[in-house]
Amino acid sequence: MARLAAFDMDGTLLMPDHHLGEKTLSTLARLRERDITLTFATGRHVLEMQHILGALSLDAYLITGNGTRVHSLEGELLHRDDLPADVAELVLYQQWDTRASMHIFNDDGWFTGKEIPALLQAFVYSGFRYQIIDVKKMPLDRVTKICFCGDHDDLTRLQIQLHEALGERAHLCFSATDCLEVLPVGCNKGAALTVLTQHLGLSLRDCMAFGDAMNDREMLGSVGSGFIMGNAMPQLRAELPHLPVIGHCRNQAVSHYLTHWLDNPHLPYSPE
């Protein structure tokens, strides 16, 4: 029996309209009744996630910013990881050959250089939004991550440019097909979950996890039971071909699987 369940948000626990379904909320409550520790592991900001948990009266640990921060049930900071200032400076000041928009995150929020209303559709559930600033005036010593949002082919070309410029000084990953992230070296959800399990006196074998994108790869590959969403990025399936694939987030597939796991743990599972 797993003792901790870790959930990605976008494309996993959230439906395509970026809301949590009623079945999902009911299933999360059932997990808590079984004393299973809930953990939300997401690229979203801790300020947004704390607001969501408060609105839903959910007790959960938070892995946010794709592993840059880990917070306890009470909001205590358990782990932090920031980009080195020289890496942040290079990414912010370099002229990249890309049409993608750039977004900077630190403990105060989400910052970008111009209005992009379409991006806010993913935040209708919480009302969280960016702040418009001159990105070249950002403090460089406390940047948690930098994201580029745009067309996937354009981002793939940008990934090559970033890798050539940064080498091994940063971790690059796609948190969605349209979002490329620049993270501290060694920073990912799996590493953050390792920190959390050590804090809780658990092992990764005691954990189950669900995800759909390449920023979930390390987490899914390290836990005792990892599950890939039916709507997952093809690259994730190719990287972890041994893991089971469940249904689509639009059908609240995590809830569907967990209901079966709670009620019929000894019977085979079918996502249909």
Curated annotation (Swiss-Prot):
The keyword Plastid does not apply. The active site is at residue 8. Its EC number is 3.6.1.-. It catalyses: 4-amino-2-methyl-5-(diphosphooxymethyl)pyrimidine + H2O = 4-amino-2-methyl-5-(phosphooxymethyl)pyrimidine + phosphate + H(+). Keywords: Hydrolase, Magnesium, Metal-binding. InterPro entries: Cof, HAD-like_sf, HAD-SF_hydro_IIB, HAD_sf, HMP-PP_phosphatase. Mg(2+) binds at residues 8, 10, 212. GO terms for molecular function: 4-amino-5-hydroxymethyl-2-methylpyrimidine diphosphatase activity; magnesium ion binding; phosphatase activity. It comes from the Bacteria. Its cofactor is Mg(2+). Catalyzes the hydrolysis of 4-amino-2-methyl-5-hydroxymethylpyrimidine pyrophosphate (HMP-PP) to 4-amino-2-methyl-5-hydroxymethylpyrimidine phosphate (HMP-P). Belongs to the HAD-like hydrolase superfamily. Cof family. This is HMP-PP phosphatase. It comes from Escherichia fergusonii (strain ATCC 35469 / DSM 13698 / CCUG 18766 / IAM 14443 / JCM 21226 / LMG 7866 / NBRC 102419 / NCTC 12128 / CDC 0568-73).
